[in-house]
Amino acid sequence: MRENRPVIALDFPTLEDVKAFLAKFPADEKLYVKIGMELYYAAGPEIVRYVKELGHSVFLDLKLHDIPNTVKSAMRVLSNLGVDMTNVHAAGGVEMMKAAREGLGEGPILIAVTQLTSTSEEQMRDFQNIQTTLQESVVHYAQKTAEAGLNGVVCSAHEVAKIKEATNQDFVCLTPGIRPAGAAVGDQKRVMTPDDAHQIGSDYIVVGRPITQAEDPVAAYHDIKAQWNDQ
């Protein structure tokens, strides 16, 4: 189920910024983009409709986490927007994840967040009071996500091999925190290069600032895409 296009994180504050960014790409180049909280809360459902009308694929990254019925209802709305992928927090529990799957339907890819890539093992133990290793926590969440009938998880590339071993090889692993070699890591604690993620078995990678803030975003995108596809 591997996606050969890097997913571009559209971390912009307005729809106009998104329009300006996407206009840099040829009209016939269909991208896979991530719309996160900032952009969705600023622009609303219109941002999803706009991007879909251009023919791009959309990962709507809202990380829903609420009681099962509320999440089910919200997912029904997102399904009507035509998103290609969306997510929930695995910490919401198996029943919540099952409700999310029911609300979204079987078409779009539904994944769960395990531990955020900004979370260190020390932070997890101190704040969340989870007294295992970070990897054990992530694998546990992944197993529960599979049990709930979801397609996969958001995880660091460091955990991909263990997750697929604990679930199955078709279980989707989407990896954020991807940086080209030599790029600044920002606020991500656990990062890898596109080639590293390819070699370790990630199915999707998410790349933001190295593309969106590049002097030439189109060239940066194609360079990262080549690294991701080991070309």
Swiss-Prot record:
Pfam families (alphabetical): OMPdecase (PF00215)
Biological process terms in GO annotation: 'de novo' pyrimidine nucleobase biosynthetic process; 'de novo' UMP biosynthetic process
Family matches, as SUPFAM superfamilies: Ribulose-phoshate binding barrel
Molecular functions (GO terms): orotidine-5'-phosphate decarboxylase activity
Keywords: Decarboxylase, Lyase, Pyrimidine biosynthesis
Record EC number: 4.1.1.23
Catalytic residue positions: K63 (proton donor)
Gene Ontology CC: one annotated term: cytosol
Residues at which substrate binds: 11, 34, 61-70, 117, 179, 188, 208-209
Catalytic activity entry: orotidine 5'-phosphate + H(+) = UMP + CO2
InterPro entries attached to this UniProt entry: Aldolase_TIM, OMPdecase, OMPdecase_AS, OMPdecase_bac, OMPdeCOase_dom, RibuloseP-bd_barrel
Domain of life: Bacteria
Primary enzyme class: lyase
Quaternary context: Homodimer.
Family per record: Belongs to the OMP decarboxylase family. Type 1 subfamily.
Primary role: Catalyzes the decarboxylation of orotidine 5'-monophosphate (OMP) to uridine 5'-monophosphate (UMP).
PANTHER family named in the record: OROTIDINE 5'-PHOSPHATE DECARBOXYLASE (PTHR32119:SF2)
Protein name: Orotidine 5'-phosphate decarboxylase
